[in-house]
């Protein structure tokens, strides 16, 4: 095993594992195996209202039925509050974050329109100079201006990516108004603490990557290599998800779903990879992955 490679799969326990999630799990697993590395699972259960009781255990059981067992015990984000608090305190001490009293409506009104390509509203910096009499609701990370705001990185699938944090995103939230930790802070702290060297995930998270790289720099932690795979969409062109009615995987017959996932990843035509046993499928799929993304020499 190559201790220099550490990858992970990070599902949210909002329901059972479905085909869209399987594609992400398979891609991250194949990349780890092709590199002879360690594959981890992190349960991203910070969003309490959306977390379904028992879903995390169900996801782990499904992964096991599909032949994907993490090399170390899974980590739950809900147990990581102290680590997130320590990271925020470091940023506060460095003067890189500030409290924000703006509501989403106030931000929308000040902008008149949100940038369509982002899941959060771009922030105009209203509270950068103070709360102006409003109560603190959230904590935001101050992004730089000018050329320093442009974050460029090479994605192993999507190639060179660039984003201007100042004009396209604005100062972004690290701790939400409801007291919950924002995804960007949690994932950066978790990846750093786990020693993650390679992140393989869906392209729906591509827009988050520049923010995460900037936050990594602020915290002085390494930046992993990134690979964003195409997401699975439904008949309406929407991302396949639990919210759009994605159904649970059939545990008792994993090979058809695995072959379809490999086909989605461009590794083979649907059904071309060997059936019969999981071992035969994974051996062929890992070789096919390594031919594109390396190295698996010998």
UniProtKB/Swiss-Prot annotation:
UniProt binding sites for L-glutamate: 8-12, 44, 183, 201
Coiled coil regions in record: none
Co-factor binding details: Binds 1 zinc ion per subunit.
EC number: 6.1.1.-
GO biological process, one term: tRNA modification
Record Pfam families: tRNA-synt_1c
Source organism superkingdom: Bacteria
Keywords: Aminoacyl-tRNA synthetase, ATP-binding, Ligase, Metal-binding, Nucleotide-binding, Zinc
Residues reported to bind ATP: 242
UniProt xrefs under Gene3D superfamilies: HUPs (3.40.50.620)
Motif 'KMSKS' region: positions: 239-243
Cofactor: Zn(2+)
A GO-annotated cellular component: cytosol
Residues the entry annotates as binding Zn(2+): 100, 102, 123, 127
Broad enzyme group: ligase
Motif ('HIGH' region): 11-21
Similarity comment: Belongs to the class-I aminoacyl-tRNA synthetase family. GluQ subfamily.
Function: Catalyzes the tRNA-independent activation of glutamate in presence of ATP and the subsequent transfer of glutamate onto a tRNA(Asp). Glutamate is transferred on the 2-amino-5-(4,5-dihydroxy-2-cyclopenten-1-yl) moiety of the queuosine in the wobble position of the QUC anticodon.
Protein name, entry field: Glutamyl-Q tRNA(Asp) synthetase
Native species: Burkholderia cenocepacia (strain HI2424)
Protein encoded by which gene: gluQ
């Amino acid at each position: 095993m190559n201790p220099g490679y550490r990858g992970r799969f990070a599902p949210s326990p909002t329901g059972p594992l479905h085909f869209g999630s399987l594609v992400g799990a398979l891609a991250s697993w194949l990349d780890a195996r092709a590199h002879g590395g360690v594959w981890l699972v992190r349960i991203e259960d910070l969003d309490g209202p959306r977390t379904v009781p028992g879903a995390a255990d169900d996801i782990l059981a499904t992964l096991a039925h599909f032949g994907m067992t993490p090399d170390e015990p899974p980590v739950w984000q809900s147990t990581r509050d102290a680590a997130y608090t320590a990271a925020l305190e470091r940023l506060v001490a460095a003067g890189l974050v500030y409290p924000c009293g703006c509501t989403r409506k106030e931000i929308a009104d000040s902008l008149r329109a949100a940038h369509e390509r982002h899941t959060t509203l771009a922030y105009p910096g209203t509270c950068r100079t103070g709360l102006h009499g409003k109560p603190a609701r959230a904590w935001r990370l101050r992004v730089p201006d000018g050329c320093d705001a442009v974050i460029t990185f090479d994605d192993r699938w999507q190639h060179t990516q660039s984003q201007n944090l100042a004009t396209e995103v604005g100062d972004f939230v690290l701790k939400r108004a409801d007291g919950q930790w924002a995804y960007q802070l949690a994932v950066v702290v978790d990846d750093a603490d786990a020693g993650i060297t390679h992140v393989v995930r869906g392209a729906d998270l591509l827009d988050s990557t520049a923010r995460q790289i900037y936050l990594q720099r602020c915290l002085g932690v390494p930046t992993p290599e990134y690979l964003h795979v195409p997401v699975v969409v439904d008949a309406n062109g929407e991302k396949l998800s639990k919210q759009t009615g994605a159904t649970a995987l059939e545990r008792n017959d994993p090979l058809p779903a695995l072959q379809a996932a490999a086909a989605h990843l461009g590794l083979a035509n649907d059904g071309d990879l060997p059936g019969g046993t999981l071992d035969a499928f994974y051996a062929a799929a890992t070789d096919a992955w390594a031919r594109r993304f390396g190295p698996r020499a010998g």
